[in-house]
Amino acid sequence: MRLFLLLLICMLSVSSLVAGNREKMSEESFTLSNFTDEERNSVSCPTRGLFDSSGLYVADLSRYTSKDWSYPLRGGKVISPFGGSRKNHQGIDIKTYESDTIYAVFSGRVRFSKPFFGYGNAVVIRHYNGMETLYSHNRKNLVNYGDYVHAGQPIAIIGRTGRATTEHCHFEVRINGRPYNPDLFFDCSCHRLRPVKVIVSSSGKIKIIRLSPKQDTIQSPQKIGRDN
């Protein structure tokens, strides 16, 4: 009887491990493994396998809890909006104090971490939800290519490397390589995640559906799984 129970426990443990590995492999095959040379060496590139069979990408941010996300620069103020006076300003500039810490907004894997032309020191994270975020002009990157990071993890120190006139974080949100206004997803005035469903077509057209938040959205780190 004791031997039978031991065998049963072992079988359950192996089954659980296999299921967990299968979930992880499925998650990684979506966006997070086998980066190409282009993905390793460019801040902007398409995300393979992002769209479903109908050609849509969907992410429901209303279901995220306080542990699933973080504002990139806590206490920061937007000093230059998306677009703005510069026609091709593809993100927002967030200003705070010198040597402040920049945090990963969602969990995911570091796809890029090195200098890139006018961006200076840059970090690009491909997230479990399929989005990518970019953080640049960093004085120092705290993460390396291939690292897995969780929401709220320190990833860089604010700086003014590259084409920058003051210490700040240039922050971008990209879906399939296309930049979208971060204010669609984050209320930057009060540092909150917007409770929205994001729908993007393969042509790049975006639709934002406002929803009621299911739970609180105050910052705190942890990983979530892929949106379906």
Model-flagged regions — what are they?
Residues 2-6, 15-81, 192-228:
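Polar/charged, compositionally biased leader and regulatory segments
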Residues 63-71, 83-115:
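Short, glycine/small-residue-enriched coil/turn segments at secondary-structure junctions
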Residues 77-79, 91-93, 122-124, 134, ...:
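Soluble periplasmic/extracytoplasmic beta-strand elements of cell-envelope proteins
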Residues 79, 95, 109-114, 139, ...:
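Conserved positions in beta-strands of structured domains
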Residues 89, 104-142:
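Zn2+-dependent peptidoglycan hydrolase active-site motif and core
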Residues 101-111, 143-158:
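Short, well-structured beta-strand-loop connectors
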